[in-house]
Amino acid sequence: MSKIGLFVGTTTGKTEEAAEKIKEEFGGDDVVTIHDISEASPEDFDGYQNVIIGCPTWDVGELQSDWSGFYSEELDNVKFTGKKVAYFGTGDQIGYADNFQDAMGILEEKITGLGGTTIGSWSTEGYDHEDSKAVKNGKFVGLALDDDNQADLTDERIKEWVKQLKTEFGV
């Protein structure tokens, strides 16, 4: 089994594409296994001490549909105590400036309440948004990606974030 479980939901494919880039930056299948949250069960989290959650913000500050279903039906049954959890999200900071990356913040708050330890916070510098549920103590709770307005920064952001996570995960 790989060292990191990456659980992702996607509608347009952008979040899944980012997940693949994150996996490759870590070193591929030997290190990261990607799980589609629409097909995942709470038991799929059991084998991992290191977890990455990937979710786009959908509509106006909402969870993407696959995550919404898992959130309401399954998330409370995941044993997060003792797990390090990193988050990344995709969104549009210009079109949805008042709720950029809210889904990441919604999931982080819930998972922290279930015992997960958040790692991988990310600076808000270089972003142009008004508000976000994903900002705590002046930083995003995880990596914020915006392929609608800053696609040219995505690869470098992923590279830097994974470098940070390798240290924080201890892998």
Curated annotation (Swiss-Prot):
Keywords: Electron transport, Flavoprotein, FMN, Transport. One of its GO terms (molecular function) is FMN binding. This is Flavodoxin. Coiled coil: none annotated. Residues 4-166 form the Flavodoxin-like domain. It holds the Pfam family Flavodoxin_1. It comes from Trichodesmium erythraeum (strain IMS101). The keyword DNA damage does not apply. The lineage of its organism: Bacteria, Bacillati, Cyanobacteriota, Cyanophyceae, Oscillatoriophycideae. The gene is fld. Low-potential electron donor to a number of redox enzymes. Belongs to the flavodoxin family.
